[in-house]
Amino acid sequence: QVTIKENIIINAKLIKDSPKISMDDLKLINHKVSTYTTTYGSGNSRGGNVENAANKIDDLLLMPGEEFSYENAVGPVIASNGYKYAPVISNGKLVDGIGGGVCQVSSTLYNTQLNAGILPTERRNHSKAVGYVPRGLDATLASGSIDYKFKNTYEYPLVINTKAINGKLTIEIWSNEDALKGIDYKPVSYVSGNVANTYLYGYDKDGNKVYEKHIDTSVYR
């Protein structure tokens, strides 16, 4: 019988991992800042993609200064991640592609974000106008090339809540009751032909315009 004895020394470094958000931070999230709703056809592959993408961003937390990437949040847009083939817009035409419907979620979130007074850091419109949001208020995704992003510019954490059921998609942004500083934000698109110029306006409690920003110019085919 042979007995082998070894003295094994393991150099371990203790790392104190702090949670991303504290209970005090959570207590600051006490108010629905904005909401937006679109409708979709349920019971088919596209509707399933809408619901899948919406579920992936439900309860998503952004700390102050943190940037949201739609592609990182819902991707990869592949079959093994729950997505199916459905109509997508490619070069101004409807074709069958994986993940058709995910852009309805990004576009619904885009409107929710603008209603919350938050500007995009990256956003592109579809090559062809869509029917679920006005022109100039859509946000497309092309995996690996086009993303949709925004940064939490509040002094408080924010949470994205989604609900997609029976053909109705609603997205809410929650944060602190003082996040908007008393300003009511409204995006408006001015459409001329195939071009839409989108502005974000802010109004105080008396209805006076206190903020105006040209966001983007969207050109459609």
Q: What positions do the PLM features span?
A:
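Well-ordered beta-sheet/strand-loop patches within structured domains
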Residues: Q1-R221
